[in-house]
Amino acid sequence: MKTISIIDAKHHVNEKVKIGVWLTNKRSSGKIAFLQLRDGSAYFQGVVVKNAVSEETFALAKEVKQETSLYVTGVIHEDKRSHFGYEIEIEEIEVVGESNEYPITPKEHGTDFLMDHRHLWLRSKKQFAIMQIRNEMIRATYEFFNKEGFIKLDAPILTGSAPEGTTELFHTEYFDRDAYLSQSGQLYEEAGAMAYGKVFSFGPTFRAEKSKTRRHLIEFWMIEPEMAFMHQEESLEIQERYVAYLVQSVLDNCQYPLQILGRDTEVLKRYTELPYPRISYDEAIELLQQSGKFPDVKWGEDFGSPEETYLAEHFSKPVFVMNYPKAIKPFYMKPHPTRDDVVICADMLAPEGYGEIIGGSERATDPKYLEEQIIKAGLDVKDYEWYLDLRRYGSVPHSGFGLGLERAVTWITGEDHIREAIPFPRLLNRIYP
């Protein structure tokens, strides 16, 4: 007899198998017990028929408690009524680990309670579906960039150089000097691009933002590619192909998790249609002003959540907003060739109210200009001498971008809050568990 995972049930219809599971819920009548089971690969139902098993087995099926771990042995059958499509007719049950008074009962619980018990809430069907999709997006990320000829270059987490200033950085001591937890691997990826052409990093980043919005985490994961000999328009093409690839990979490989979440796949299919619209910051301001909904919006300010939502919904798919004012963007962006007041950059805004999921730009290549911008940003040039060296020794046009994984997961899954998109969210008021 074979031991299998639930996800492999379709390959063993009408076969007797053994599966290691946890009990998520149960109900029973006088003659039949229905056990909702999970094993980390999928969820399905176990059916225990009183007349088909021993008295001890049926009694155990009725008494076993939520989240008890079990080995169940039985025959796999098709179950067209369920999302999963299969169930097991149980013949034997073996208790592996008891579970008494499991705190997360099937009733409704508040957000704070579930966050306090996040280590257990991860076992829920909804969290299972979200993490399956997150995992698929990570897998697809590596696949996409490997196919495109990128190599992964790991950027340090501890750094003495800040890409966007130090006001939102976590400070620590590095023996006898200051250091910070990284808020971006971009500067190091630029060094990698000058060595290897096309590189990307994927790792945790930290922002000490005192923000409580549904879009912000203190610790999150970023995908940051950098490309040598590449201008902004070529970078935009890679960005949209990458995002469409993520969406298509989820559609192809996560039908079951999407069904669990009730995500509209027809909407997701629309996001695979390229190219995505492109508008300038100037045009975005004009659209907002003409809408009559944003009387206070004016040129020179960054967009907030309502403005980003309106712009993306206007196009019903991801949209690039290009060439933002220089004053509201970081020092490393390349100035526009015909305008002193804007830089060559773009944010990708996701529809359905999710806002910015990518920020990118063509990078400045003139070392004198960069040094001036570093000083204007209130940073110490000595900390960036290595970065300026990249312009002094064989500089080339190069571009890059960063995609926040959790924002993208939240968007693709259709969840309301970014805290659901990471296993253990770090929020302004939460660092436990």
From Swiss-Prot:
GO terms for cellular component: cytoplasm. GO terms for biological process: asparaginyl-tRNA aminoacylation. It catalyses: tRNA(Asn) + L-asparagine + ATP = L-asparaginyl-tRNA(Asn) + AMP + diphosphate + H(+). It holds the Pfam family tRNA-synt_2. Keywords: Aminoacyl-tRNA synthetase, ATP-binding, Cytoplasm, Ligase, Nucleotide-binding, Protein biosynthesis. The keyword Nucleotide-binding applies. GO terms for molecular function: asparagine-tRNA ligase activity; ATP binding; catalytic activity, acting on a protein; nucleic acid binding; transferase activity. It is found in: Cytoplasm. Its EC number is 6.1.1.22. Its main location: cytoplasm. SUPFAM superfamilies: Class II aaRS and biotin synthetases, Nucleic acid-binding proteins. Gene3D superfamilies: Bira Bifunctional Protein, Domain 2, Nucleic acid-binding proteins. NCBIfam families: asnS, PRK03932.1. Belongs to the class-II aminoacyl-tRNA synthetase family. Homodimer. This is Asparagine--tRNA ligase. It comes from Ligilactobacillus salivarius (strain UCC118) (Lactobacillus salivarius).
